[in-house]
Amino acid sequence: VYGMASAYMLTGDDQFLEAAEKGTDYLRDKMRFVDTDTGMIYWYHGQKIGAGGQEQKLLVSEFGDDYDCIPAYEQIYALAGPIQTYRLTGDPRILDDAEKTIDLFDTYFRDKEKGGYYSHIHAVTLSAHDESLGRNKAKKNWNSVGDHAPAYLINLWLATEQDRYKVMLEDTFDTICKHFPDYDNSPFVQEKFFDDWSKDQQWGWQQNRAVVGHNLKIAWNLMRFQAVQP
């Protein structure tokens, strides 16, 4: 969906816009869950289609890294295509989805005391500190903090110029600049952290390895924001 919306921006070809709108409608129809008690929006990990065509919604992740959790990055990237489409259409339904998903981030993923956003929450307790989260308990990482900007947040701010999104951008970038660089030990950023922002260099496959693309994302998005907000 993001690709189709971006292709329309580059070419003006209506078939790309049509695809982006249809893709957004599909995501809203098949992958969105509205909590009627809180008004917040969650996005499903996926859905299974049975032999008879029946649909089974999957809220918790089935990926090994995030198994049986709700990972922040899945909620973050659910907004990527729709928000790029919103920049083109101004569809108020998309903006409403974004606002209610950000409410979810602020309520359950955000660490209001020490800053940043937790990487995973439990699907029932909605706590980042639930023991059943295992190695993902009370953790923060590049995805949960830094991916807001490239996935949807800069585009949402450009589309609306609302202070809420500008403040969130500034906060996430300040958090990245404060905690992620590790120049005394590496030219690459530190990517995974414990609750108190101490380094987690023993997690799963990553250990103390760098992801080069994440470093490029940081530089790219810091400069994007710098260009419009010196």
Model-derived segments and spans:
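Glycan-recognition and catalytic cores of secretory/periplasmic carbohydrate-active enzymes
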Residues: 1-230
